């Protein structure tokens, strides 16, 4: 099993910078003010023949109230999970009361702890470390996480007691299993839903919009099946986005939508649908992600309010009618378990593969049932269909004059293929291509000449394949 390293310290000492250095990613937000990392964030790293897992935590200041207290609790939970704690302090600002409070907790916890003095670049190391000796946590280790100085040698020593990679179990692979993106505008209950799905308080839940600033990736198993949950920062209306970190978080949210296999879009039944919900759903659709809708805070609503919400969804979310919908209470767990079958169906549909013969048969049956219209006195012909990709599924239809095919007929084909193939929870995209026969532009070409040209083309293709 991978050794687990927890990065602990007061806010803005460089924990997220070191996390990014150790995992070689930019998965943790990094900016020059405290409080950016509010939840436990997990990443994997490799050094030589050793693998490890790193937990980035929110800062502990020692006088937490409200949200800060929830962040501090997440840090303490990370300490319990870890094999090793890297207690980070700031060599530039020096020792303070919060550092001493954290050190007291670590001594009581008796977890293997390394005292790491960060931001020592440009400082005389002995002077920078001198006052931290009195914390009683052993030799302080100077590093500069932003530039990588002394980081490799530190981790090499930290991992020395642990066996090499061959003797470890395979490290948890964050790409293994269905990646579920939990998305929505701020304070609709995303983090509460994540915690309910996981069965533990892994993500900070607090009644303040925007408490999840990072996209938190959490691998887990349910009934022997692997998943990765991605809890994203809520997307706010653009005019409400002011702080640099908030803007960065929205970018992370949109990146998480692209990276997930299935997006659970959380809607707030109490506040109803707003424009930001529609914009975010439109982004999911344009990204081609499979989608499950979760209408949260459904419990306790009056029947009139429920009917009003259902009507609004039917009227305004017609463009996402491919998604299965559930009315849930993340806080109480009502109907949350029903999300998993929908997630699986959406994932399976998004990654389905069908033979050219089957797709062409469906196309021909659809054309027989309802022919394309005449364009300038000539009937649009649709000859064959094959699959052009997956996640989302793409069906390529060949014929003539396909550029003139009306949108209404394209919708008819989409609905027909979706019904016959039983595609649920994912967009189904079509590409229409017209024939490229060089004789098509020559009205005087005989059928024999056209057949001869086609045979010549097949011969060339066969020779090319033999090479």
Curated annotation (Swiss-Prot):
Residues 352-436 form the KH-like domain. SMART domains: AAA. Residues 3-166, 178-351 form the EngA-type G domain. One of its GO terms (biological process) is ribosome biogenesis. GTP 1 binds at residues 9-16, 56-60, 118-121. It comes from the Bacteria. Gene3D superfamilies: 3.30.300.20, P-loop containing nucleotide triphosphate hydrolases. GTP 2 binds at residues 184-191, 231-235, 296-299. InterPro entries: AAA+_ATPase (IPR003593), G_ENGA (IPR031166), GTP-bd (IPR006073), GTPase_Der (IPR016484), KH_dom-like (IPR032859), KH_dom-like_a/b (IPR015946), P-loop_NTPase (IPR027417), Small_GTP-bd (IPR005225). Residues 431-467 are annotated as: Disordered. GO terms for molecular function: ATP hydrolysis activity; GTP binding; ribosome binding. Keywords: GTP-binding, Nucleotide-binding, Repeat, Ribosome biogenesis. Residues 445-467 have a biased composition (Basic and acidic residues). GTPase that plays an essential role in the late steps of ribosome biogenesis. Belongs to the TRAFAC class TrmE-Era-EngA-EngB-Septin-like GTPase superfamily. EngA (Der) GTPase family. Associates with the 50S ribosomal subunit. This is GTPase Der.
